[in-house]
Amino acid sequence: METTPIKPTAADETTPSAEQSSNRSSTAKPMSASLREKLKRSRHSFKSPLSVVKRLKIEDDTEPQPSQQGEEEKHGVKDDRDSNVTETDVNRNDMKLQRDSNHTAELPSQQCEALRKAVKERTETLRRLKMVKMYRKKNDLNELQRLTDKWRSCAQSVLYELQRELATGGKQASLSQLIDSFGINDKLLHFDRTEEDFTDT
């Protein structure tokens, strides 16, 4: 009569392992204090590689990319060129203004003096014309002419009389000397020096 083999049950299979674990736990020695302190230190000093990778990734992200650096350098060069061009234009304008001012300051002093003299003469002529215009408005020209002729006749008579009174040693003073001593214009008296006499007498 054949006998069938008996298969071991799960309880039978687990029984030795349980026994082994119980034996191990019973045979395990308690951990010493120095060993526990070393384990604590090793835990604190241990660094996970994931944290190192994360830190490296963040640092890489913060660093500028080569393309960004190239663009920034291009913009920087362009800004420097623009600033250099602006400074060059400003310097050229300053030099031009300085040359113009120097050219103006180099005007000859003789030319300035001639201009001042011309302005003074024109001002005096304008003043006299205004006076003539004013007298013409206020007075009659015929009356003025009559008074001028009367004054000339009186002046000529006085000069003749002075010439006779001032004669010394039978020698009379010339009319030219008398007119020059009084500072009278020959044209006002109608006096001719070549003839040494008045033209309207």
UniProtKB/Swiss-Prot annotation:
Q: InterPro entries per the record?
A: SFR1, SFR1/Mei5
Bias (Basic and acidic residues) occurs at 71-103
What does the record give under GO molecular function?
transcription coactivator activity
Which keywords has UniProt assigned to this entry? Coiled coil, DNA damage, DNA repair, Nucleus, Transcription, Transcription regulation
GO annotation, cellular component aspect: nucleus; Swi5-Sfr1 complex
The family this protein is said to belong to: Belongs to the SFR1/MEI5 family.
Name of the protein this chain belongs to? Swi5-dependent recombination DNA repair protein 1 homolog
Q: Which organism is it from?
A: Danio rerio
Protein encoded by which gene: sfr1
